[in-house]
């Protein structure tokens, strides 16, 4: 017996949609949605394809996701070619199976079933889909959200299909995410010969006490919903490659994953004060890729928890751990935002796979969420 969720997932995997190339995935989704009465608005920006689709009116529940995938790596190391979906021992293999073409298929099939049973549903059901989530994310969801906000589009609830689960589908629901702030710092010195240090100014030596103090800071202790803020040095570069040249500059890149206990401005102020304390000559560039957001218990979280408990008989953990997602952009609209998707154990890896039965389960969960919020 064929399964529409598995079949649609396989069709999507066969399209090698390396970010930001959609490779025809959205056309497939749009065709299915238009067939059940959705109005579709394509919202392409630069090399990125996006669409916003809706059916009905009133209180709005949107399902959000991305059609793009990360590169497969060495295809010879896959048990099957990465863009040729294969089921082995109940597991569906292929790039994007878990992140997140399986979720997209589950969303669309859930919508088809929901509309068939509730053709005159009272709320509005919507989809926000992009082909630029895995790469720069500059022309994807953030641009669509800006356009929707500019015309006062309504969005009450949003479910992002990112692979949130750890061991079984629904064991973890993400009801928020930490903020992400990156600092690109250059410490300026004076280049010179290592035999004549008095004629130079070594920026590595100058910066060492600053960096030692920076990494020792306890930024906060987190709270009920968020772990403590984390600061990690990601890159350090200095020198010409020669052993007899004192470098003229030191470049340090570090990233903060921060909770709602802090703002990005508070972090910046503390870093800049520390730089001044150590009397360093520097230039600094900040990149805020997302503010922290949190969806407290309410109609959306309750509907998601209910759906998971109904179909999997487990109570999901509500967590805010992990990296950023497009939920950070959607939260700007004032919507309640949660993430519910398949098990994430193999995402971005060789032999990415998902339990085929989990995708069927996910479609049922998504449909039950629709029934609770917009039926």
From Swiss-Prot:
<feature type="binding site">
    <location>
        <position position="348"/>
    </location>
    <ligand>
        <name>Zn(2+) 2</name>
    </ligand>
</feature>
<feature type="binding site">
    <location>
        <position position="99"/>
    </location>
    <ligand>
        <name>Zn(2+) 1</name>
    </ligand>
</feature>
<protein>
    <recommendedName>
        <fullName>Succinyl-diaminopimelate desuccinylase</fullName>
        <ecNumber>3.5.1.18</ecNumber>
    </recommendedName>
</protein>
<dbReference type="GO" id="GO:0009089">
    <property type="term" value="P:lysine biosynthetic process via diaminopimelate"/>
</dbReference>
<dbReference type="GO" id="GO:0050897">
    <property type="term" value="F:cobalt ion binding"/>
</dbReference>
<dbReference type="InterPro" id="IPR050072">
    <property type="entry name" value="Peptidase_M20A"/>
</dbReference>
<dbReference type="GO" id="GO:0006526">
    <property type="term" value="P:L-arginine biosynthetic process"/>
</dbReference>
<dbReference type="Pfam" id="PF07687">
    <property type="entry name" value="M20_dimer"/>
</dbReference>
<dbReference type="GO" id="GO:0008777">
    <property type="term" value="F:acetylornithine deacetylase activity"/>
</dbReference>
<dbReference type="GO" id="GO:0019877">
    <property type="term" value="P:diaminopimelate biosynthetic process"/>
</dbReference>
<feature type="active site">
    <location>
        <position position="68"/>
    </location>
</feature>
<keyword id="KW-0170">Cobalt</keyword>
<keyword id="KW-0378">Hydrolase</keyword>
<comment type="function">
    <text>Catalyzes the hydrolysis of N-succinyl-L,L-diaminopimelic acid (SDAP), forming succinate and LL-2,6-diaminopimelate (DAP), an intermediate involved in the bacterial biosynthesis of lysine and meso-diaminopimelic acid, an essential component of bacterial cell walls.</text>
</comment>
<dbReference type="Pfam" id="PF01546">
    <property type="entry name" value="Peptidase_M20"/>
</dbReference>
<dbReference type="InterPro" id="IPR011650">
    <property type="entry name" value="Peptidase_M20_dimer"/>
</dbReference>
<feature type="binding site">
    <location>
        <position position="66"/>
    </location>
    <ligand>
        <name>Zn(2+) 1</name>
    </ligand>
</feature>
<keyword id="KW-0479">Metal-binding</keyword>
<dbReference type="InterPro" id="IPR005941">
    <property type="entry name" value="DapE_proteobac"/>
</dbReference>
<comment type="subunit">
    <text>Homodimer.</text>
</comment>
<feature type="binding site">
    <location>
        <position position="134"/>
    </location>
    <ligand>
        <name>Zn(2+) 2</name>
    </ligand>
</feature>
<dbReference type="InterPro" id="IPR001261">
    <property type="entry name" value="ArgE/DapE_CS"/>
</dbReference>
<comment type="pathway">
    <text>Amino-acid biosynthesis; L-lysine biosynthesis via DAP pathway; LL-2,6-diaminopimelate from (S)-tetrahydrodipicolinate (succinylase route): step 3/3.</text>
</comment>
<keyword id="KW-0028">Amino-acid biosynthesis</keyword>
<feature type="binding site">
    <location>
        <position position="162"/>
    </location>
    <ligand>
        <name>Zn(2+) 1</name>
    </ligand>
</feature>
<keyword id="KW-0220">Diaminopimelate biosynthesis</keyword>
<feature type="active site" description="Proton acceptor">
    <location>
        <position position="133"/>
    </location>
</feature>
<dbReference type="InterPro" id="IPR002933">
    <property type="entry name" value="Peptidase_M20"/>
</dbReference>
<dbReference type="InterPro" id="IPR036264">
    <property type="entry name" value="Bact_exopeptidase_dim_dom"/>
</dbReference>
<comment type="similarity">
    <text>Belongs to the peptidase M20A family. DapE subfamily.</text>
</comment>
<dbReference type="GO" id="GO:0009014">
    <property type="term" value="F:succinyl-diaminopimelate desuccinylase activity"/>
</dbReference>
<keyword id="KW-0457">Lysine biosynthesis</keyword>
<dbReference type="GO" id="GO:0008270">
    <property type="term" value="F:zinc ion binding"/>
</dbReference>
<keyword id="KW-0862">Zinc</keyword>
<feature type="binding site">
    <location>
        <position position="99"/>
    </location>
    <ligand>
        <name>Zn(2+) 2</name>
    </ligand>
</feature>
